[in-house]
């Protein structure tokens, strides 16, 4: 369904500091590089990362979905190293099937350099093509750079609940839900939409 969209990869762009960046979907050969990437994410960010990412099972789940029907994980590379990860997740049914979920992680050396901005454009395009009418992202309130990038891309803060979520050390943090309305590719809308 998305083969013609995948033909645009790799997408090349320039970060704010002038570094060349290349973005493409996750490949089976990326497992070691992705593990290395997760190990450089600061401890304060790791407190919010799902364990499935750290233990490698999420990577296996993503690779098994080689048609990208459920998840589209994108990797941003700078100097042949992963500088960012962005994922679009599509619910396969139910009352929220029209709402995609996006999530991002950025290498600490590249925070604030526009990686999220570049991946966001691509994931918004894919979401519209999938027939999604909205995208949402759940964040902790401390992710100020990510919140700023998402707002610049048109996302609005839908909900902020103070001291609502707990990190892996049982410390409370603000919960933030951001969302954007899409203009979907209507030929790809599901029945009942």
Question: How does the language model describe each region?
Answer:
Residues 17-18, 31, 36-50:
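Helix-loop element at the rim of GNAT/NAT acetyltransferase active sites that forms part
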Residues 19-21, 79-85, 173:
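Glycine-rich phosphate/pyrophosphate-binding loop shared by adenosine-nucleotide-utilizing enzymes
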Residues 21-33, 181:
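A short beta-loop-alpha structural element at the N-terminal edge
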Residues 51-98, 103, 107-108, 181-183:
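Acetyl-CoA-dependent GNAT
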Residues 113, 117, 129, 141-160:
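Conserved active-site alpha-helix within GNAT-family acetyltransferase domains
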Residues 120, 127-139:
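Conserved GNAT acetyl-CoA-binding A-motif
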Residues 136-139, 151-173:
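Conserved catalytic-core motifs of GNAT/GCN5-like acyltransferases
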Residues 163-193:
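C-terminal "cap" of GNAT-fold acetyltransferases
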